[in-house]
Amino acid sequence: MTISKNNKMMAHLNYRMKIILQDGRTFIGFFKAFDKHMNILLAECEEHRQIKPKAGKKTDGEEKRILGLVLVRGEHIVSMTVDGPPPRDDDSVRLAKAGGAGGVGQAKPGGRGMPAMPGMPGMPPGGAPGGLSGAMRGHGGPGMAAMQPGYGGPPGGRPF
């Protein structure tokens, strides 16, 4: 099974990544976003550069700069490798997954009423749940004779 480039990139979101550019610079930061041009957004980014030795010196040094949030143009990227796993947020509040039980402060859709009643597989539920089926005959309200039109006026008063 082949995995598209887009899925590979999505799998590495929030990972600590090391990006090498054409000019030899290296950016290390947390991979936050990308687009169709493979422009990369890195958070808490550091730039590492190799310093060429001056005439007469034998050792070359490395210069490190802390940059913060950086947008790297995809055209200049040579390689991109995983430098570390995504950071763990133990201090943050755990949020319920989508479809979990709602609570105070959580937006949940209203739904479509009561869940389906258990019954035979593939068969519709038998009837309305208790309390939602309507009034029962003979319980409460006037009798059928009182509901017929032309029964008379209001009790104890003259018509308007």
Swiss-Prot record:
Q: Name one Pfam family in it.
A: LSM
Keyword Ribonucleoprotein present in the record's keywords: the answer is yes
SUPFAM superfamilies this protein is in? Sm-like ribonucleoproteins
Chief localisation class: nucleus
User: What keywords appear on the UniProt entry?
Assistant: Cytoplasm, mRNA processing, mRNA splicing, Nucleus, Ribonucleoprotein, RNA-binding, Spliceosome
Composition-biased stretches (Gly residues): 99-113, 128-143, 150-160
Q: Name one GO biological process term.
A: mRNA splicing, via spliceosome
Q: Give GO cellular component annotations, separated by semicolons.
A: catalytic step 2 spliceosome; cytoplasm; cytosol; U1 snRNP; U2 snRNP; U2-type prespliceosome; U4 snRNP; U4/U6 x U5 tri-snRNP complex
What sections of the protein cross the membrane?
A: none
Q: Where in the cell is it found?
A: Nucleus; Cytoplasm, Cytosol
GO MF terms on file? RNA binding; snRNP binding
Give the PANTHER family listed for this entry: SMALL NUCLEAR RIBONUCLEOPROTEIN-ASSOCIATED PROTEIN B (PTHR10701:SF0), SMALL NUCLEAR RIBONUCLEOPROTEIN-ASSOCIATED PROTEIN B AND N (PTHR10701)
Please identify the protein, giving its name as recorded: Probable small nuclear ribonucleoprotein-associated protein B
Species this protein is from: Caenorhabditis elegans
Q: What is the lineage of its organism?
A: Eukaryota, Metazoa, Ecdysozoa, Nematoda, Chromadorea
Gene of origin?
snr-2
